[in-house]
């Protein structure tokens, strides 16, 4: 089963219907959307009442980016053959985005797969042509991607995606589960820890980091 997972909060929830609309026009459609809200934001749930393809989960704690997928993987009892695609609540995705991820998954079926970004005219942009709902300058963006340089080079593959977008590429790491460090509250944004937690839950993860 292909699960598209995301989270949101009051300042961004108005974006989510547009984000979902961009995902409903994909060339490959997901089996379901899962939106996780923290309990303090449960009042936002009504926005999705008339969306039968959306499952809303409520969690006690606000675990930030981890809310995108860990609660869903636990609550929905995902299995090893389930796929988890994480998306953002402020991006509009092009129709081929899911197909590109599925292609990369078919090439590297045992690897977590991450979309990456490029820098254009002072704005951070996602590969594959998706756009920000509200474009904004992302000063200091480099620090969020410094961890790529810390991974062993023999664990990394750089695979060109479609020639239609010269900026588009995927990064996969076949041995992240080996190099992963344990998740703990002191490192809530550790990509290594995120991947380790995903492998412990057996479902396969890919998405925007």
State where each predicted segment sits.
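Active-site-proximal specificity loops/subdomain of glycosyltransferases
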Residues: 36-81
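Short beta-strand-to-loop acidic/aromatic patch adjacent to the donor-nucleotide binding site
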Residues: 80-92
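Short, acidic, metal-binding catalytic loop of nucleotide-sugar glycosyltransferases
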Residues: 19-31
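C-terminal catalytic/acceptor-binding lobe
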Residues: 1, 7, 14-19, 145-209
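Residues at the starts of beta-strands that form the adenosine-phosphate
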Residues: 31-32, 83
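Conserved donor-nucleotide/metal-binding helix-loop-beta segment in metal-dependent transferases, i.e.
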Residues: 95-119
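Conserved nucleotide-sugar donor-binding
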Residues: 125-143
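Catalytic phosphate/metal-binding cores of nucleic-acid and nucleotide-processing enzymes, i.e., regions
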Residues: 1-15, 19, 40, 56-58, ...
């Amino acid at each position: 089963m292909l699960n598209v997972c995301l989270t949101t909060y009051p300042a961004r929830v108005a974006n989510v219907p547009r984000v979902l609309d961009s995902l409903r026009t994909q060339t490959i459609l997901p089996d379901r959307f899962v939106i996780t809200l923290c309990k303090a934001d449960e009042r936002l749930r009504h926005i999705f009442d008339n969306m039968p393809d959306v499952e809303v989960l409520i969690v006690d704690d606000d675990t930030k980016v981890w809310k995108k997928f860990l609660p869903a993987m636990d609550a929905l009892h995902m299995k090893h053959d389930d796929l988890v695609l994480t998306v953002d609540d402020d991006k509009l995705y092009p129709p081929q985005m899911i197909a590109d991820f599925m292609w990369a998954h078919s090439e590297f079926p045992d690897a977590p797969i991450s979309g990456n970004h490029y820098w254009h005219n002072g704005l951070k942009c996602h590969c594959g042509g998706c756009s920000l709902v509200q474009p904004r300058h992302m000063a200091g963006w480099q620090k969020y991607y410094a961890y790529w340089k810390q991974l062993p080079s023999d664990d990394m593959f750089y695979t060109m995606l479609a020639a239609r977008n010269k900026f588009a590429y995927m990064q996969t790491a076949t041995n992240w589960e080996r190099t992963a460090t344990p998740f703990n509250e002191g490192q809530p944004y550790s990509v290594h820890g995120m991947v380790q937690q995903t492998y412990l839950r057996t479902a396969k993860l890919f998405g925007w980091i």
